């Protein structure tokens, strides 16, 4: 009896729309795509969707920095993301955005149902507020000194030096990462999702046996420490969806982000017309729903998301498929080393199938980190795909094309060997189905070794020279081609581009069920190179290009872009400049000038008068009095209509309000020379 086709909805975590896709992201999308392609080969009805996560403070602020509207920025980023995923042959049925009408409607619907069911609580909270920008600050937008280890320049939620976690209000000398201002405490009414109300349901889901053991164990730790109500609101200004009947309040990005899965599918349903949204999302849905995610967002997907769905009368996920991080050459991806590689940069230098294969050869169903060792990457791809698989076709196709006009023999030379290959279909299918692609690859490569050993032993290049053995030659080479066909059928979920070229060469589609019948008396096409070896130089160029990419990115966003470093001077030229520490004794407005301040500077025994164009940044000049600064002391006096300026104080910044007077470190005294 034929197996009934399953209806499956598969998602990947939504990439954030404020940055490019890199090879760390690609692990998840490749893993999911391999699984989806396998399920489709097995006859299941799979809908594969994703979207850009397009809301939140970081996107709002980055758009401001770029001088464009957030809508323009996320549209441009979506185009780049989709181009990268297409380059890696990720077979999405729909790629959407959380900033969509569908997502707005569904977010409002879910919120309204949660509120009607008593799961939304209101309470007033105190949080840090940036008085210059007029906005409440997320934890990651507050920086200061760690209250535990006293390390400076740490985020408002955890210390990257000692690992401590804390509230942003505990930071020593906190500053807004947006404006540099000292934040103040302000109260605001926020809306909370009552997550603890779903504790029993979530614990039962955890114990159901569906989740990965590592995920279930981690969830148990969270249950033991106690679930907390979840703040789902943010105050204006915020780029996102305004909460119904709550002017100036917006849904927190992590509320509408997972709803983006639903929004992307709803958009697909509306486009197609033959899909029923409710069939996949209603409470009693019999369809399967799987989320591929990284281990860093398990908390949201294993607790908040199923609870939100339960509380709003939608179905829960069938399962979460969680993976680890990507390291490169045994270390965290590094911009300085060129191992922080963007997907687009990779595609300019290498074939997407190479990375797909390497990740597949390392992935399992466990939440283990994957190391992309670039040397091993080159060796494994060349050894496995080129030397073992593609070489099997090239060793045999030449004889078939030249001696037999491209026609395969009408019988198998070794039916028992062929059956060994087709019998492996069950265990390889089980491996793919269970997301054990590394196990599948090991089995496939073991078969490839057997196939090549068969060709070595039969030695068609010797048979070709012997009189009267044409039939043997055709049978041997046809056997090799048929074994190649089986191998490529098993590799089809992993290597879509190579599969397409292989199908053109073999003049047949590769399907899982068709391998039971070998190609007999079949016409193949002329053999053309199916796959190129990885050139180490190309990998090195990619790494070098990644360094250049990051250098360019820094230049674009940093002050150097607008104010490049000037021509090199000699040390003797620099030595002529005499810079000294100066104490600002007095600072006053200059009558008749809206740009200048008049400063009286003490150099430790000598007093100077200096006119400085810093008034726009210091509207109250008295705040400068008593402060140490740096001045050029041997600059020739300059006669101005307001008086004589006897030097120059040092400041940084582009101008206007963004002028920053330089100050020396503690211990410096007036008159000291700066060297």
From Swiss-Prot:
UniProt entry keywords in alphabetical sequence: Aminoacyl-tRNA synthetase, ATP-binding, Cytoplasm, Ligase, Metal-binding, Nucleotide-binding, Protein biosynthesis, RNA-binding, tRNA-binding, Zinc
EC id: 6.1.1.10
Binding site for Zn(2+): 146, 149, 159, 162
Domain tRNA-binding: start-end pairs: 573-675
Compartments, as annotated in UniProt: Cytoplasm
UniProt entry tagged with the keyword ATP-binding: yes
Cofactors required: Zn(2+)
A family per Pfam: tRNA_bind
Lineage: superkingdom: Bacteria
Protein's UniProt keywords contain Cytoplasm: yes
GO BP, one annotated term: methionyl-tRNA aminoacylation
Cofactor note: Binds 1 zinc ion per subunit.
Main location: cytoplasm
Cross-referenced InterPro entries: aa-tRNA-synth_I_CS, Anticodon_Met, Met-tRNA-synth_bsu_C, Met-tRNA_ligase_1, Met-tRNA_synth, Methionyl/Leucyl_tRNA_Synth, MetRS_core, MetRS_Zn
Gene Ontology molecular-function annotations: ATP binding; metal ion binding; methionine-tRNA ligase activity; tRNA binding
HAMAP family reported for this sequence: Met_tRNA_synth_type1
Subunit: Homodimer.
Protein name: Methionine--tRNA ligase
UniProt lineage: Bacteria, Pseudomonadati, Pseudomonadota, Gammaproteobacteria, Enterobacterales
Gene transcribed to yield this protein: metG
